[in-house]
């Protein structure tokens, strides 16, 4: 995506959304224009948020001068991808995270792997403690390590895939189209942050306004389906998040 394309898409979203999350599965730190995107988003009144696997933090010191409001680092990706040398990884993550937090960015170190690849969680927390000593303040979802610096834990869930079997859940729920949408690099609007392949295209921001797209028959059917706790789209029927989200407060 070019800077002009980003400018066009964010202009289309201005006044309609508040938060911009710079990922739809991809690794945002790979994009050379990420600092410019963040600064433009701030100028337009958006609140930018980045989720990253943290492997490129040491190479992107330029981001320290163009920090988002919030930086989420998925530590669980390290064990899930079978990477070596966790000490070096945590070293690089913590060096960037502590500096970003001191500059006012909210940094969340995520361990979203309960019930899955979580064998290294204990050692990872110990490595973090070597670089940000305990005691930490316990929270409902993890710990506060210092001002603007947190560790957050959550259950692992299975990403949606049309090749998966349908979940046999009597009730499902999702925040798609309630408090989130996704926009792919080509302008395609999808219902949520998990539809990275564009399996549920609702329209394109280069062709239509967001309000026109959200009023489409496909979008309204999906929204009303989740209102009645039913997944109407094949991809949603194969999504681990909607299957486990009964533990969340259901919104009408």
Regions found by a protein language model. Give the residues of each.
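Short Cys/His-rich "knuckle" micro-motifs
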Residues: 246-249
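Short linear motifs in exposed loops
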Residues: 32, 192-193
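Conserved glycine-rich "GG(E/T)P / GGGxP" loop and the immediately following alpha-helix
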Residues: 1-140, 144
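Short, small/polar residue-rich loop motifs at catalytic or cofactor-binding pockets
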Residues: 174-177
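C-terminal accessory region of radical SAM enzymes
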Residues: 100-107, 132-169, 194-244
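Short, acidic, Ser/Thr-enriched surface-loop or helix-capping motifs
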Residues: 184
